[in-house]
């Protein structure tokens, strides 16, 4: 089960054999009030996913030109490498939308961050590439208001995990 602040509060109360307290209920209420904005953000990121992925990969290639000039399976010197880069950026974006829908960092923690260092070192991938891609997505997602705040929270969380 994916952890969210609500599921953690329920688990803690259940472990202690008690009902949810006022603080926990207020926290749940706050989450439900933000849920509409989170769903709007997930919908916006999803509907613009290909544009965001394409722009993010171009931002990586511009900041790190060696990624398109160096041959090898971890680089984007050919169409196969470019496809892998787009796939990886898409994976990050998809997991961010899952976190928005779940209302917590559980999907990011479980599906992305756990084992991230091992994956990057095994395949000789630079976290800075994905930081740049996520910064581009954050700056260009086209969301506004509370939906932008919700999306940026999870994008920043992923950036911090990579940094």
Swiss-Prot record:
Post-translational events: Contains one covalently linked phycocyanobilin chromophore.
Membrane-topology annotation of the record: Peripheral membrane protein
A Pfam family recorded for this sequence: Phycobilisome
Main location: membrane
Residues the entry annotates as binding (2R,3E)-phycocyanobilin: 85
GO biological process, one term: photosynthesis
Origin superkingdom: Bacteria
Compartments in which it is found: Cellular thylakoid membrane
InterPro entries documented for this protein: Globin-like_sf (IPR009050), Phycobilisome_asu/bsu (IPR012128), Phycobilisome_asu/bsu_sf (IPR038719), Phycocyanin_a (IPR006246)
GO CC aspect terms: phycobilisome; plasma membrane-derived thylakoid membrane
Keywords: Antenna complex, Bile pigment, Chromophore, Electron transport, Membrane, Photosynthesis, Phycobilisome, Thylakoid, Transport
Role noted for this protein: Light-harvesting photosynthetic bile pigment-protein from the phycobiliprotein complex (phycobilisome, PBS). Phycocyanin is the major phycobiliprotein in the PBS rod.
PANTHER family: C-PHYCOCYANIN ALPHA SUBUNIT (PTHR34011:SF4), PHYCOBILISOME 32.1 KDA LINKER POLYPEPTIDE, PHYCOCYANIN-ASSOCIATED, ROD 2-RELATED (PTHR34011)
Family, per entry: Belongs to the phycobiliprotein family.
The protein's assembly and partners: Heterodimer of an alpha and a beta chain, which further assembles into trimers and the trimers into hexamers. Part of 2 PBS rod complexes, the conventional PBS rod and a photosystem I-specific CpcL-PBS rod.
Protein's recorded name: C-phycocyanin alpha subunit
Organism of derivation: Nostoc sp. (strain PCC 7120 / SAG 25.82 / UTEX 2576)
């Amino acid at each position: 089960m994916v952890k969210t602040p609500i599921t953690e509060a329920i688990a803690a109360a259940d472990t202690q054999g008690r009902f949810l307290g006022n603080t926990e209920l207020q926290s749940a209420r706050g989450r439900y009030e933000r849920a509409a904005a989170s769903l709007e953000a997930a919908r916006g990121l999803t509907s613009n996913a290909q544009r965001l992925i394409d722009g993010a990969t171009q931002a990586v290639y511009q900041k790190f030109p060696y990624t398109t000039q160096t041959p090898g399976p971890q680089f984007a010197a050919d169409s196969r490498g470019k496809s892998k880069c787009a796939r990886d950026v898409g994976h990050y974006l998809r997991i961010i939308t899952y976190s928005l829908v779940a209302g917590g960092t559980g999907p990011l923690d479980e599906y992305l961050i756990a084992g991230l260092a091992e994956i990057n070192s095994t395949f000789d991938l630079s976290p800075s590439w994905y930081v740049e891609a996520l910064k581009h997505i954050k700056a260009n997602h086209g969301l506004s208001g509370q939906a932008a705040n919700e999306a940026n929270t999870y994008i920043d969380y992923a950036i911090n995990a990579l940094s």
